[in-house]
């Protein structure tokens, strides 16, 4: 099964005050921690104004959301990845989850069966749909949702066959799924840094 690894980094980062993807933590931009978990061969979903910065940092595969869905949130990024990069299995990580480990990503991929449209981890009782694995067949549902301007990821998940799996069932720690929304969050995740 051909896998496409995708970092979602097209958000506006309003609460953070600057593009989160490039915020430096432990010597490198946040998105590079996600890349470390996904592997070097990643597709980065960006937005106008940020694409050039990724290219300047040496990234080769950087896309912006397809018009007319630009600025429509993570569903647009997921759809764009599936529309522009041919694969069967898409592994997504939001750029603001720097603690996710490579072992966790590998374990989530192994959970996807032919009966599943997606594998979504659950940490501390909350689904984590932006650090998850999706089969290509969900692309049509993404398209329908975008066409109807129904941008809630929970609505999308309700329409597909999701295998929800507790983080500890795949050897993951709940803290791996903490996302950075404010600059102060960088200090709060410090105790969980494995290095």
From Swiss-Prot:
Catalytic activity: Mo-molybdopterin + GTP + H(+) = Mo-molybdopterin guanine dinucleotide + diphosphate
CC terms in the record's Gene Ontology section: cytoplasm
Class of this enzyme: transferase
Sites where the protein binds Mg(2+): 96
TM ranges: none
EC numbers: 2.7.7.77
InterPro entries: MobA-like_NTP_Trfase, Molybde_CF_guanTrfase, Nucleotide-diphossugar_trans
Gene Ontology biological process terms from the UniProt entry: Mo-molybdopterin cofactor biosynthetic process
Listed CDD domains: MobA
Binding site for GTP: 8-10, 20, 65, 96
One Pfam family from the record: NTP_transf_3
Location of the protein in the cell: Cytoplasm
Transferase among keywords: yes
Cofactor: Mg(2+)
Record's keyword terms, sorted: Cytoplasm, GTP-binding, Magnesium, Metal-binding, Molybdenum cofactor biosynthesis, Nucleotide-binding, Transferase
Family note: Belongs to the MobA family.
Notes concerning its domains: The N-terminal domain determines nucleotide recognition and specific binding, while the C-terminal domain determines the specific binding to the target protein.
Name of the protein in question: Probable molybdenum cofactor guanylyltransferase
